[in-house]
Regions:
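Conserved active-site and cofactor/substrate-binding residues in soluble primary-metabolism enzymes
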Residues: 369, 534-537, 541, 618, ...
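Conserved H-X4-D acyltransferase segment
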Residues: 367-381, 667-678
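Long, low-complexity segments enriched in small/aliphatic residues
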Residues: 621-626, 630
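A terminal-accessory region detector
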Residues: 636, 643-645, 659-663, 674
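The feature captures the catalytic groove of carbohydrate-active enzymes
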Residues: 280-284, 290-292, 360, 405-407, ...
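Aromatic (Trp/Tyr) and acidic
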Residues: 662-690
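Short glycine/serine- and small hydrophobic-enriched flexible loop segments
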Residues: 376-379, 434-441, 541-548, 673
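Anionic coordination/interaction segments
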Residues: 1-372, 383-396, 408-409, 422-446, ...
Length: 721
């Protein structure tokens, strides 16, 4: 995308005719839960969670093709009907011609302003959109200006379709769930309170009200309303050419109640005459609440345009304060771009993987990796509280080295997985150590290693391969000892269990098993024989890093030993002959897992820091040397790189094959980061990556070469383009 220009040092930018760029949208959210997407034409959606969508859910394709978006119309007496968003049949017919309206989008952190000017209608419209930090409501401040030389008489109407239910109902029971709608008009707008909510949780009594209310800048209320889609668009009409707008039709009055129809927040204001250069404004509020009083309070809080602008400034200041990192280079555009890069982790925390049009993976919530990524971002921009966040996150580790995969809404809250056999991502044990090391490197807080945290417990045991038949919900979600006391261990102990259990869980080539996938979720079809050499590198690097932290801890504290779970001694056998044997390593792992299937002994042992450090280094060095010796591949021209994976037939994935060269980026990155790759190997990897993965058209390196097949013995990623 080209053409945007930064306006200040806080990332504010503007872009002319932004609607001519396909799939463009902007995130606007608050901290109370409402999260929205806005296109330049005010398309997009708004929701609190998967089951609570204010506006109809959209994917990337819907951004271009949906008709029912947020809109604000002016019926101009004697001329026609003009959409301030550009979302009208008339304006769309002018697209890519000289008759197209002049338009511009200006935006900053969590706010957007669209400006549109029509030669035909001699009007300029400005729509400022944002969400207050502490409220679940979108605020639109609409300003209409007469740019002509003569007085203009216009009738303004806000028109926002209210979806008001779960995203599941976009196809499943779409019509049936509209029958649940109970629509009511008040003196300021339209309220929709469905009787029930239909979603994967079953049929539940609904307590949410979805609404659109508004008034003019001087407090004038709408004269009437268009509360249903069928009355608004009319017979044969649609949201781009609605009957009610074209005919300036009379709506229903306040106090009207309607059941069982699709709803629209249609607010029909009184006719107003604007002299040349005169302007008028309207305040539109679209939101979700469980308390009707919150809607009434809006008319008391935001009585004027000035009150809305005051709220906007508070909102801007709040989000700018979150990004307290500044960049100073010779390129001012790069500095401002990096301001947005710094804001991205905040957007990721709010939206997750599920709630933006191009990020529609799953149904919301955060995953295990997200917990640690949040810590990394906060360490740079808001370090207060990171220590406690780390401690709380470690409580999601199971005693078998795996971890909870269902994350609660509160910090340190984890939910039991009730599936018989759960999916295990083999990379999950990597990230806590990487985050902890970064935290200690930044703060020098080596004492964190001796702080204690609980262990998560549910019926999943033996790293997701068996279930604990003795566990039920009365046991609770915290690991206990045989004495019924909650088991707690140091952060060091948690790190050791995650990385040591992974070290022993190997496939037939003595690399760590791929299991359900690694950080590439799409490598998900090799759970029996798949191995991730890429993340074996990462674990090898972690073992070396733990040893380094232990040395620094000993030097700082003067302590000679650390207290660890007695059962962990099984995993601390230090014998090259053991490391060379897949069978013996799996036996050690099984022996350990058997000792803590239900409860732990509750016993602790003192381990020499010096011996533990030596032990970890031996394991790390063995694993790195094993990879150097067995996983280095070459093409016919002697270009070399590391194989990163084994498929579900136990075959090496990368190399110079009969169907061509196969190379993946992940294994190269982690072999270099961990220290597995020698200086000479790094040079060869770089040369090979430049040869096989670099693509100037995409501006960088691809994740892999084209394998030329849908490789169903490794993962669904090979079905993607």
């Amino acid at each position: 995308m080209k053409g945007y220009q930064f306006e200040d040092t806080q990332g504010t930018f503007h872009l002319k005719k932004a609607e001519n760029i396909s799939y463009l949208y902007f995130p606007i959210a608050g901290e109370a839960g409402l999260k929205s997407s806005f296109t330049p034409n005010l398309g997009g959606d708004a929701k609190i969670d998967q089951n609570t969508f204010l506006l109809e859910p959209v994917s990337a394709e819907n951004l271009v093709n949906n008709r029912n978006s947020r809109n604000f119309w002016c019926n101009v007496k004697g001329i026609g009907s003009w959409s301030l968003t550009g979302h009208s049949a008339e304006e769309l017919s002018k697209k890519f011609t000289e008759m197209q309206d002049d338009s511009e989008v200006t935006a900053g952190f969590m706010w957007q302003k669209t400006t549109r000017e029509s030669k035909k209608y001699q009007l300029r419209g400005e729509i400022l959109s944002f969400i207050p930090v502490d409220k679940n409501v979108e605020i639109m401040l609409v300003t209409i200006t007469n740019t002509g030389r003569m007085a203009q008489t216009v009738t303004p109407t806000a028109a926002i379709p209210l979806y008001g239910r779960s995203a599941d109902n976009i196809r499943d029971h779409r019509h049936v769930t509209s029958l649940l709608h109970r629509i009511e008009t008040t003196d300021t707008g339209v309220l929709v309170t469905p009787t029930l909510s239909f979603d994967e949780r079953g049929h539940q009594v609904n307590h949410m009200t979805y609404y659109c209310v508004g008034w003019s800048g001087n407090g004038e209320k709408p004269v009437d309303f268009y509360p249903t889609a069928e009355d608004f668009v009319g017979e044969g009409g649609n949201f781009e050419r609605p009957y009610a707008i074209v005919k300036n039709a009379e709506g229903v009055k306040a106090g009207t109640k309607i059941e069982g129809l699709e709803a629209v927040g249609g607010l029909h204001f009184s006719e107003i005459t604007l002299e040349p250069e005169e302007e008028c404004s309207y305040l539109i509020f679209t939101g979700i609440t469980e308390d009707i009083q919150e809607i009434r309070n809006l008319s008391k809080t935001y009585t004027t345009r000035e009150k809305v602008l005051e709220e906007l400034e508070k909102t801007k200041a709040y989000w700018q304060e979150k990004v307290n990192v500044a960049y100073h280079t010779g390129d001012s555009d790069f500095n401002q771009f990096m301001h947005w890069v710094s804001f991205q982790p905040i957007l990721r925390r709010i939206y997750g993987c599920s709630f933006l049009p191009h990020h529609d993976y799953g149904k919301g919530g955060r995953g295990w990796r997200d917990l640690w990524q949040d810590c990394l971002a906060l360490l740079i921009m808001n370090p207060d509280g990171v220590r406690q966040m780390l401690l709380d996150n470690f409580a999601g580790v199971r005693i078998d080295g795996s971890n909870a995969t269902i994350i609660g809404s509160k910090q340190g809250e984890f939910v039991a997985d009730r599936n018989n056999i759960t999916r295990v991502w083999m990379d999950h044990g990597v990230w806590p150590m990487i985050t902890t090391k970064f935290y200690i490197d930044q703060t020098g807080d080596l004492e964190l290693l001796e702080k204690e945290a609980a262990y998560f417990k549910d019926k999943q045991i033996a790293r997701g391969t068996r279930t604990d038949t003795l566990w039920d919900e009365s046991y609770g979600c915290w690991q206990k000892t045989k004495r019924g006391v909650r088991e707690e261990g140091t952060i060091l102990e948690h790190l050791l269990l995650q990385n040591l259990t992974a070290f022993y869980e190997v496939g037939e080539h003595n690399n760590i098993r791929l299991r359900g996938a690694d950080w590439n979720d799409a490598l998900d079809m090799a759970c029996e024989k798949g191995e991730s050499v890429a993340f074996s590198n990462a674990y090898a690097g972690n073992l070396a890093d733990i040893a380094e932290l232990l040395e620094a801890y000993q030097k700082k504290t003067g302590k000679e030993t650390v207290s660890l779970l007695a059962e962990i001694v099984i995993l601390l056998e230090d014998n090259p002959a053991l490391y060379d044997s897949v069978e013996k390593k799996l036996h050690v792992l099984e022996e350990y897992l058997h000792t803590c299937e239900h409860d732990t002994s509750g016993e602790k042992v003192e381990i020499s820091i010096e011996k533990l450090t030596e032990n970890l280094r031996h394991k790390s060095e063995w694993l790195m040397e094993h990879i150097r010796k067995n996983e280095w591949v070459k093409d016919s021209e002697e270009n070399g790189w590391f194989n990163g994976y084994y498929d579900n037939h136990g075959r090496q994935v990368e190399g110079d094959t009969k169907t061509g060269v196969r190379m993946m980026l992940t294994g190269q990155v982690f072999s270099i980061m961990a220290g597995t790759a020698t200086e000479e190997q790094i040079r060869q990897i770089t040369k090979s990556a430049d040869r096989y993965l670099y693509d100037e058209k995409v501006g960088g390196y691809r994740l892999n070469t084209d394998f030329g097949e849908v490789k169903t013995d490794l993962g669904r990623m090979f079905g993607f383009s």
